[in-house]
């Protein structure tokens, strides 16, 4: 099932029953870090490839600042078009993919849980923040799958495992929020699977419009 324009958005926020005190899993003083880290996993190697550019441009309108880090991993429809960006005001700072994972070339599989894990390890280590938000961006099919990439996709158990592994490596506490900019991901089954990995889960119970979230209001 895919994102379509005419439908209204119904959002579901599910709060974990056991919120965790926020800490930072690195040597930097928490007070010196930006309050918010916004890490966006943009799986656009499908019919949403043009929306990757549109949403990235919206993020550039805001840009990272003393209170906010915006970091993205993007993939679009053509080959050799995967990129890791630190989004700044009206621009981006790109990190070569081989610096994140030495096996990565210029085309990565966004439907692989290892890709999500490696992105989060890199993004939260290089651009740490007091409160961390992971957004998984793409088509969604509820508990069945999300982040489609030429036949591969992420399942919800894969997402849980990816976040568990990233947290084990970095020592980070549960995320402040996991958000799905994708259709049909506001399900109790999804929230239950991810309940130990984030304080809040945010997703749509219905179809999202093609444009998805509005990122120029971060």
Roles of regions detected by a PLM:
Residues 99, 140-169:
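A short, glycine/acidic-enriched catalytic loop
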Residues 1-31:
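Secretory targeting signatures
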Residues 175-218:
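Active-site-proximal C-terminal subdomain of hydrolase catalytic domains
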Residues 37-42, 69-74, 132-136, 176-180, ...:
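Structural recognition of the beta-strand scaffold that forms the well-ordered cores
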Residues 44-47, 76-80, 138-144, 150-153, ...:
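Solvent-exposed loop/turn segments at secondary-structure junctions
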Residues 57-61, 161-165, 189-195:
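Mature extracellular/periplasmic domains of secretome proteins
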Residues 123-143:
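Active-site groove signature of glycoside hydrolases
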Residues 29-130:
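N-terminal extension/subdomain marker
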């Amino acid at each position: 099932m895919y994102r379509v324009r005419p439908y209204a958005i119904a959002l579901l926020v599910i709060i974990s029953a056991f919120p965790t005190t926020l800490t930072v899993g690195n040597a930097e003083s928490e007070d010196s870090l930006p309050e918010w880290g916004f890490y966006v996993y943009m799986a656009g190697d499908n019919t949403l490839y043009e929306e990757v550019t549109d949403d990235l441009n919206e993020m550039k309108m805001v840009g990272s600042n003393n209170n906010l880090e915006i970091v993205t991993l993007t993939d679009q429809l053509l080959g050799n078009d995967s990129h890791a960006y630190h989004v700044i005001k009206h621009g981006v700072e790109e990190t070569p993919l081989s610096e994140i994972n030495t096996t990565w070339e210029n085309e990565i599989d966004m439907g692989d849980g290892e890709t999500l894990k490696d992105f989060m390890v890199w993004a939260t280590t290089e651009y740490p923040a007091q409160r961390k938000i992971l957004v998984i961006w793409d088509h969604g099919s509820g508990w069945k799958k999300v982040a489609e990439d030429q036949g591969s996709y992420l399942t919800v158990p894969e997402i849980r495992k990816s976040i568990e592994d990233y947290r084990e490596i970095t020592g980070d506490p549960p995320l402040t929020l996991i958000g799905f900019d994708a259709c049909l991901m506001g399900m109790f089954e999804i929230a239950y699977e991810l309940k130990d990995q984030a304080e809040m889960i945010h997703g749509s119970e219905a179809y999202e419009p093609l444009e998805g979230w509005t990122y120029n209001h971060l």
